[in-house]
From Swiss-Prot:
One Pfam entry name: GHMP_kinases_N
Catalyzed reactions per annotation: 4-CDP-2-C-methyl-D-erythritol + ATP = 4-CDP-2-C-methyl-D-erythritol 2-phosphate + ADP + H(+)
NCBIfam families: ispE
Gene that this polypeptide is encoded by: ispE
EC number: 2.7.1.148
SUPFAM superfamilies hit by this protein: GHMP Kinase, C-terminal domain, Ribosomal protein S5 domain 2-like
Associated pathway: Isoprenoid biosynthesis; isopentenyl diphosphate biosynthesis via DXP pathway; isopentenyl diphosphate from 1-deoxy-D-xylulose 5-phosphate: step 3/6
Gene Ontology MF, one: 4-(cytidine 5'-diphospho)-2-C-methyl-D-erythritol kinase activity
Key words of the record: ATP-binding, Isoprene biosynthesis, Kinase, Nucleotide-binding, Transferase
Residue positions binding ATP: 90-100
Species of origin: Chlamydia trachomatis serovar A (strain ATCC VR-571B / DSM 19440 / HAR-13)
GO term, biological process aspect, one: terpenoid biosynthetic process
Family (UniProt): Belongs to the GHMP kinase family. IspE subfamily.
Stated name of the protein: 4-diphosphocytidyl-2-C-methyl-D-erythritol kinase
Function: Catalyzes the phosphorylation of the position 2 hydroxy group of 4-diphosphocytidyl-2C-methyl-D-erythritol.
Length: 288
């Protein structure tokens, strides 16, 4: 069985302050995108994991094995399984690669063993696997509140396009939040839903990302776009309404900016509640 494990963007992320448990209270807008890893699952004689493009992730601490352990405890099914992952999402990129793998693995196990777990059950289990893991059991667009793990589904679809800019070095989420100062936080009375409050602390840690954003702002200056960091980084992204591509002048400028900047152009993706995210046909995935 083959599954897309999609990346996510934080279209905005606002920090409301530090909680009594020492974590930060946030509100964020999650969006799944048509870019991600490919997971394949089969029943086997022994447990195994192969990660193409990132063999250093073939460890017992991989988020996929955490999903397997949780699934086995919950269902009592202990049949060995074999995983093959074609890794595309960079580590420490703010794209939730590990969380997406964990969620996709949980969904895949439910499918292959026909255990009939509901989305609500899997979402509840996913809260034990990571802050943004539950999001992937939404339709692909949601608000995240509390630490980001409490999901409020959004039914409206967005007609945006995104251009992703990866970094050769990731950012640890824990390090980014540890660098947050009170002045970085948003006022509860003046939430703008257009910014990422983690940008300032991350840019203090990573001057190269701040400079990269300035470079992108100059490159895209003549177009009505938003440029920001997703999550705690290190990925920067450009967001613009898809309708711009229908204007020949704008379309040419967009193509030029994407080409000159070396960005990866992608789109939002939605999930049918009865299925999983997909931008690939089953035959195409089987051929990889």
């Amino acid at each position: 069985m083959h599954f897309l494990s999609p990346a996510k963007l934080n279209l905005f992320l606002q920090i409301l302050g530090r909680r009594e448990d020492d974590f930060h209270e946030i509100v964020t807008r999650y969006q799944a995108i048509a870019f991600g890893d490919q997971l394949s699952l089969s029943i086997s004689s022994r447990d195994s994991l192969q990660v193409i493009n990132a063999c250093h992730l073939e460890t017992p601490s991989n988020s996929i094995w955490k999903s397997v352990a949780l699934f086995r405890r919950y269902t009592g099914i202990t049949t060995p399984v074999s995983w093959r992952v074609v890794k595309q999402i960079p580590v420490g990129a703010g794209l939730a690669g590990g969380s997406s793998n964990a969620a996709t693995a949980l969904f895949a196990l439910n499918q292959i063993f026909k255990t009939g777990l509901s989305d609500e059950e899997m979402r509840s289990l996913a809260e034990q696997l990571g802050v943004d893991t539950p999001f992937f059991f939404s339709t692909g667009a949601a608000l995240g509140v509390a630490r980001g793990e409490k999901i409020i589904a959004l039914e409206e679809s967005v007609s945006d396009r995104y251009v992703l800019y990866f970094s050769s070095e990731g950012v640890l989420t824990s390090r980014a939040f540890a660098a947050v100062q009170p002045s970085d936080c948003s006022s509860r009375k003046n939430l703008e839903y257009t910014q990422n409050d983690l940008e300032k602390p991350v840019f203090r840690l990573r001057l190269d990302l701040k400079e990269k954003k300035h470079w992108l702002e100059s490159l895209w200056a003549e177009l009505p776009v938003y440029i920001g960091l997703t999550g705690s980084g290190a990925t920067l992204f450009v967001r613009y309404p898809e309708i711009l591509e229908k204007d020949l002048s704008y379309a040419a400028q967009i193509q030029r900016a994407v080409t000159l900047s070396g960005g990866l152009l992608t789109s939002p993706i939605r999930r049918d509640p009865t299925a999983w995210y997909s931008i690939y046909s089953e035959s195409a995935l089987a051929a990889t």
